Amino acid sequence: MKKQFQWICMLVVAFCFTTTLFAQNKKTIRVGVFQGHGGAETCIWEAVQAIRLDGDMTVRTFTTADIAKGVLNNLDAIIVPGGGGSTQYLNMGEENVKRVKEFIASGKGAVGICAGAYLFSDTPNYACFRINGAKAIDIEHDNRGHGIAKFSLTNEGKKLFPELATRPLSYVLYYEGPVFTPSENSQIKYTTFATMESDVHEEGNAPINMTNNKPFFIANTYGKGRVFSSIAHPEATPGMEWMIPRMVRWTLGLPIKQYKKNVVRPNVYNQEYLMTKADLKQEHSYYETFLYGSSEEKIAALDWLQVRRSWDAKRWVQGLLFDNSPKVRIRAAKFIAETDYLQYLPDMETAMNAEKDMQTKQAITRYVEQLKALLP
């Protein structure tokens, strides 16, 4: 009996040792999202929530002061989100720009989204890193418009995003991203992973046939590291946010990871929808609706805004979880859940717990569970 007990103890110790060793060998991918002046707050939120979809990754934000303090020593990859590229450059400061470039060249990864892609470019007369081999053209018409844009994958893109490989076109949110061509002044050569198929010229007197047939995703090596640049916003597109952690994996030379079916939903948008000037006017009017409109008007506004993936609505919907109309509260929860907005999960849970009407509480609870189900 004593020997049996000893054997059991030995087996337990061996199991614990093996489990600990496995956990140590399974390296966590440490990702940082730059949170500096010039980065749009919602773009920062969305980059963070996209990384949360990958169970092997941890994510934090970091500031320009954090760079100087050595935060890059504790990161494997960084993301520079949307906003204003040159403003982000100014906020970092030249010494920190040098530190970031050295970090990437040492064998680490970097993903630039929209303004981040601008920042990584080699654009003349523009404050940028000059690390992706591309230059932005037609900057004078940068405010050319936004909306759900279409793109096609190249052969390299199909390898990285096999979930989209059989689709002739896929769709994500575009918001005034750079129009790239190869830089004559750079020795860096990039690979195109996707091509922009939408011709965006709705605003700012932008010329036609400028954005279409231009790179949508590009990637390259930089020293021992890798850089991925996206001109558009998968992280802000329901069902497509998973593309961001996939890009991070590419920058680190890591194998792709399959994400859950409720995370990979490319059929949420199956057609182009570029916001017209009339749409923008309508969108702006709904701010007043949410302040002064009836419950029916608010619900109709949320319907319209969700279909068009309104850029502004994601800032307005948070407070509607606490509207005085139960129907509006439910519709706001539905909007947040169906747009994958994990940033508002704590608000959703608070609204659920504070709700007094049982039918409304049950409905909000369903949407809370739908949102939580996105997480690994």
Predicted regions and their residues:
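Amphipathic alpha-helical scaffolding segments comprising HEAT/armadillo-like alpha-solenoid repeats
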Residues: 279-289, 310-322, 341-353, 375-376
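Aromatic-Pro/Gly-enriched surface loop or interdomain linker
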Residues: 22-74
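Catalytic beta-strand/loop cores that center a nucleophilic Ser/Cys/Thr
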Residues: 149-223, 231-235
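A glycine-rich, often tryptophan-bearing local segment used as a flexible ligand/cofactor-contacting loop or short
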Residues: 86-165
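Short inter-helical turns and helix N-cap capping residues of alpha-solenoid HEAT/ARM repeat scaffolds
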Residues: 293-294, 324-325, 356-357
